[in-house]
UniProtKB/Swiss-Prot annotation:
Plays a role in vesicle-mediated protein trafficking to lysosomal compartments including the endocytic membrane transport pathways. Believed to act as a core component of the putative HOPS endosomal tethering complex which is proposed to be involved in the Rab5-to-Rab7 endosome conversion probably implicating MON1A/B, and via binding SNAREs and SNARE complexes to mediate tethering and docking events during SNARE-mediated membrane fusion. May be involved in vesicle trafficking to the hepatocyte apical membrane and play a role in development of the intra-hepatic biliary tree. It is a peripheral membrane protein. The keyword Nucleus does not apply. CHCR repeats lie at residues 618-772. This is Vacuolar protein sorting-associated protein 18 homolog. GO terms for biological process: apical protein localization; bile acid and bile salt transport; endosome organization; endosome to lysosome transport; endosome to pigment granule transport; eye pigmentation; intracellular protein transport; lysosome organization. Belongs to the VPS18 family. GO terms for molecular function: protein-macromolecule adaptor activity; zinc ion binding. Component of the homotypic fusion and vacuole protein sorting (HOPS) complex. It comes from Danio rerio (Zebrafish). Residues 461-481, 799-852 form a coiled coil. Residues 905-930 are annotated as: Disordered. Pfam families: Pep3_Vps18. InterPro entries: Clathrin_H-chain/VPS_repeat, Pep3_Vps18.
Length: 974
């Protein structure tokens, strides 16, 4: 048998369907043009399944992609739509004349209940091929089943509700298991829980629906031909498996809650729409005699599930005497009504017919329309054919309907991905709010539209709604792109003006201070907005002008801080004598240039705080740039300012270790004028060497001299090494001070003696103190009694000098004795040296024949050689080669010269084969000269052993490779 789903007929020509639409007109004052480039596809598209049933289709059901249909009298066709090429045909095996009355398929597609016209029911599970009878159900014509969606599974339905044609509601449970030996029936139990009637007579239970509300609350909806019943109750936590009988018991003592309509067409049908899988239904539609009752499902309401209900009355062409609606299906925004020859779609938002599809007569009368609650597909069948409806873009025109109903939030939700439609909704909402005097909401909506800016602004201005205008401008500003700088500048400036106007009005009204503070905070938040920081900065002069024109000093200062225009802020505080606040701004932002600019003013009024701030800044401030402020107010200010100036100068010198001469000179001048006690201490700790001094010595000398600080002058003279001037000035202060100066020139004994003579003359001639003059002799070993005698007057007796003269004579005698002893020691030393020389002449060494040179390791006796006391022996040429690299340039040149002379004397000797008699004298002289040359050469190269002497010690720190030849040596190894 061919598949019914994997093949389709060629697409049929789709007629233009009647549905809600709007002409394509441009949006007034909008940047959008509503143009549809191609014809939109209809919302409901019908497709016929390529399937020709071998027998007439009696009943049809589909759920969770599981399709079941009854064919003829005894055949059941079951198809898994996921595998449409594997249909499953099952024979019911009925011998009587019974026919299939209804097919009931649960939401999982696992449990199928087949109701027969003989008041019998059979059961078929998805996973079996065997049909099993439901014996407990016998005797009842089943019209509806309310499935348990929460605890139903593939093998067990859980407690379900069953409605019969006689108005009885049963509770039952079906299990797919084979059961025990004594109970093989799938129906676990079947018990009556309620009874429905109309006009005092039993009424068939057309539909049953069970839904769980919040927590353990349950709602049961049952419909008859004219009535819709609701049963509300709670089940104990964990008792869901026990069934729903307790809910009906809770409603037994109450009058049944139902809605009734007068017209009876013999049956009714209710349908639900669920937006998401396994969620609760949100809307319902009940097809009955008077029309279609539809609305929302509100699970919060205590006694009724239905809300916002309304009735769609049948159109005139639906005459219940001739043309009755057969089935109904509910979608998100429409319900589809199945008539004998057509399908009609009605929008639930406005009740308008938006779709109508007429079926050709060749397919026969339409039997029923079914919607798969899981997949959302709609199925329609006749006795000869099966059709399927696809629903696409159902919400595309919903926005317009909501807009016309003034439900703007919903309208925006359904057109958020269509800018041109969203703009229309916003414009309509803005106009609606404006007409209802909700100006702020109107402004927010207008700001999001593409309407002309000028028109909207004028609209609020004419209505004298500055707050709404401000809100409009704010929202418009937020939506501008950073590249739209001109528009941003315009809006920022305008908003600033509006804020300032509003603040001025509120400030004048004492009763609105709270609102004033809120508005000011809002304005300041606007001023410091990071998004518009660049705009404010580029147009800060304009903003300053606006703030100044309104006299809003506080906000001007606030804006200046935001713009980091601290100079303006500090100037403002200084102009209003708020110097502490000005200093706080300076200290907070640590701008050295601003410190230099405003310190003179601040130092005049708050010197201590200013100096504290300077000290806190530390090295970030250059003290030289602060001198003008310090000099100005140290000359004309109070003592406090002077003390603070000295404190900062001391901080610079002692803490920051500033070496600028100007700073040290200024501190000297302050000490000289105001703290003379600190002057001498400063000079002493500053150092005694010129390289350690950071002040101007001449300036310091002049300063100390002007103020009469002689001791300080002496100290400066000493540093300047003007010892004579220092001694002369020190003698005016203290002789001991002069003595300390006289000993300073240690390397110049003549000067020291001269200075001590000055001191001695002063002591003798000025103080006339002979004893003190004698003490000068003991203090300086350069002075003798004869040096100071000329300073004494003639009438002084010798008794005053007796001790000094005796002491001098004793020193002379002692010195003579020392000289005699030194002479004797020198004579003795000379004698020992002569003895050593004589001993050396008699020394010798023994050289064995097998001895070898310490350098070349060849036999020593083959060539001239040297023998050292240490035992090392070298050939003459080997020793020469070892020593030359270690000789100085001078000695190398001298050695070279001696070798040339030696070679010359050797040549001369060889040329004289037979010396003449007269040449004997000259030959002796030449022989002596040659020996002298050899001796000189020996003194250079053989003065010490090359391995044991100083040459070897000095070579320790020499590199193995000559630095000049290092690169060459390095390259040779590569």
């Amino acid at each position: 048998m061919a598949s019914i789903l994997d093949q389709y007929e060629d697409s049929q020509n789709i007629r233009q369907h009647s549905r809600m639409s709007t002409a394509n007109i441009g949006i007034t004052h909008s940047g959008f043009v509503n143009v549809r480039l191609e014809e939109e596809k209809p919302i409901f598209t019908k497709q016929r399944i390529d399937f020709s049933p071998p027998e007439k289709i009696n009943q049809f059901s589909v759920c969770n992609n599981q399709l079941c249909m009854s064919l003829g009298k005894d055949t059941l066709l079951r198809i898994d739509l996921g595998k449409p090429d594997q249909p499953n045909q099952i024979e019911l095996g009925r011998k009587d004349d019974s026919k299939v009355h209804r097919l009931f398929l649960d939401p999982t597609g696992s449990h199928l209940v087949i109701c027969l016209t003989t008041n019998e029911c059979v059961y078929l599970n998805r996973n079996t091929q065997k049909v099993r009878g439901l014996s407990r159900w016998r005797g009842h014509l089943i019209e509806s089943i309310g499935w348990n969606k929460l605890i139903g599974s593939e093998t067990n339905t859980g407690p379900i509700l069953v409605g019969t044609s006689q108005g009885i509601i049963f509770e039952a449970e079906i299990s797919a298991s084979e059961g025990s030996l004594f109970n093989t029936n799938p129906d676990q139990y079947f018990r009556q829980v309620h009874y429905l009637e109309e006009d005092g007579k039993p009424a068939p239970v057309c539909c049953l629906e069970v839904e769980r509300g919040l927590e353990t609350k349950y709602f049961i909806i049952a419909t008859t031909r004219k009535r819709l019943f609701q049963f509300v109750g709670k089940l104990a936590e964990g008792s869901e498996q026990q069934g729903f009988s307790s809910i009906f018991a809770q409603n037994q003592d109450l009058l049944p809650s139902f809605q009734e309509f007068p017209v009876n067409m013999g049956y009714s049908e209710i349908t639900f729409y669920t937006s998401k899988l396994r969620s609760r239904p949100k809307t319902f539609a009940w097809m009955m005699g008077n029309g279609v009752l539809y609305g929302q499902l509100d699970y919060v309401r205590p006694d009724s599930l239905l809300s916002d209900v309304q009735v769609w009355e049948y159109t005139q062409d639906i005459d219940l005497n001739f043309v009755k609606p057969i089935s109904i299906v509910l979608t998100q925004f429409h319900f589809l009504l199945l008539l004998p020859d057509r399908v009609r779609g009605i929008c639930t938002l406005n009740g308008q017919v938006v779709h109508e599809d007429v079926f050709p007569e060749k397919f026969g009368t339409l039997q029923k329309m079914i919607k798969d609650p899981i997949t959302g597909l709609v199925w329609i069948y006749t006795e000869k054919a099966v059709f399927r409806y696809h629903i696409q873009k159902e919400a595309r025109d919903v926005w317009q309907m909501y807009m016309n109903m003034n439900k703007f939030d919903l309208a925006k939700e359904y057109c958020k991905d269509r800018p041109e439609c969203l703009d229309m909704v916003l414009a309509k909402e803005a106009e609606h709010c404006f007409q209802n005097k909700r100006y702020l909401e109107s402004a927010k909506c207008y700001a999001l539209t593409q309407n002309y800016f000028e028109e909207i602004a004028l609209k609020f201005i004419e209505a004298k709604q500055e707050e709404a205008l401000k809100e409009f401008l704010i929202k418009k500003l937020v939506n501008l792109k950073p590249s739209e700088k001109t528009q941003i500048t315009l809006l920022v400036t305008w908003l600033t003006e509006l804020y300032l106007n509003r603040l001025g009005q509120l400030e004048a009204d004492e009763g609105k201070q709270h609102l004033f503070l809120e508005t000011r905070e809002e304005f300041r938040t606007f001023l410091k907005s990071p998004k518009h920081k660049d705009c404010f900065y580029n147009n800060r002069s304009t903003i300053y002008d606006l703030l100044a024109s309104h006299g809003d000093v506080d906000n001007m200062v606030y804006f200046s801080v935001i713009m980091q225009d601290y100079e303006r802020v500090i100037s403002h505080y200084c102009q209003h004598d708020d110097y502490s606040a000005a200093l706080d701004v300076l200290s907070k932002h640590c701008d050295d240039k601003l410190f230099y600019k405003f310190s003179p003013v601040l130092m005049q009024h708050i010197p201590k705080k200013v100096v504290d701030a300077w000290i806190q800044m530390g090295n970030r401030l250059d003290p030289k740039n602060l001198i003008p402020a310090l000099v100005n107010y140290s000359q004309m200010g109070s003592m406090q300012q002077i003390n603070e100036t000295i404190r900062y100068m001391e901080f610079c010198v002692y803490e920051l270790d500033v070496k600028e001469e100007a700073i040290h000179n200024y501190l000297l001048s302050l000490y000289a004028k105001h703290k003379p006690d600190a002057l001498l201490w400063y000079l002493e700790q500053a150092g005694t060497h010129v390289s350690d001094i950071h002040y101007d010595l001449k300036y310091a000398l002049r300063l100390c001299s002007e103020h009469g600080y002689l001791q300080a002058c002496v100290l400066v003279y000493k540093i300047m090494e003007l010892y004579e001037e220092a001694v002369d000035l020190a003698l005016k202060v203290d002789v001991d001070l002069a003595k300390s100066c006289a000993d300073l020139p240690e390397d110049d004994e003549e000067l020291r003696k001269k200075l001590w003579l000055k001191i001695a003359r002063h002591v003798v001639q000025e103080e006339k103190d002979v004893k003190k003059a004698m003490n000068c002799l003991s203090s300086c070993n350069l002075l003798k009694i004869e040096d100071i005698l000329p300073f004494f007057p003639d009438f002084v007796t010798i008794d005053h000098f007796k001790e000094a003269i005796c002491s001098s004579l004793e020193e002379y005698n002692k010195h003579i004795e020392e000289l005699k002893q030194e002479m004797e020691e020198a004579t003795e030393s000379a004698k020992r040296i002569r003895e050593d020389i004589q001993e050396m002449r008699n020394k010798y060494g023994v050289v064995e024949s097998q001895e070898k040179c310490a350098t070349c390791d060849f036999p020593l006796l083959n060539r001239p050689f040297y023998l050292f006391l240490c035992g090392h022996m070298f050939h003459y040429d080997c020793l020469l080669q070892e020593v030359i690299p270690h000789l100085s340039v001078y000695k190398q040149n001298k050695l070279d010269e001696l070798q040339k002379k030696l070679a010359a004397t050797t040549q001369t000797t060889k040329a004289r084969h037979k010396p003449r008699e007269e040449d004997t004298v000259s030959l002796g002289k030449g022989q002596g000269s040659r020996e002298q040359i050899k001796s000189d050469i020996d003194d250079i190269i053989a003065c010490e052993c090359v391995y044991c002497g100083e040459l070897m010690i000095k070579s320790i720190d020499k590199p193995f490779i000559d630095p000049q030849k290092f690169d060459q040596e390095m390259s040779s190894w590569l």
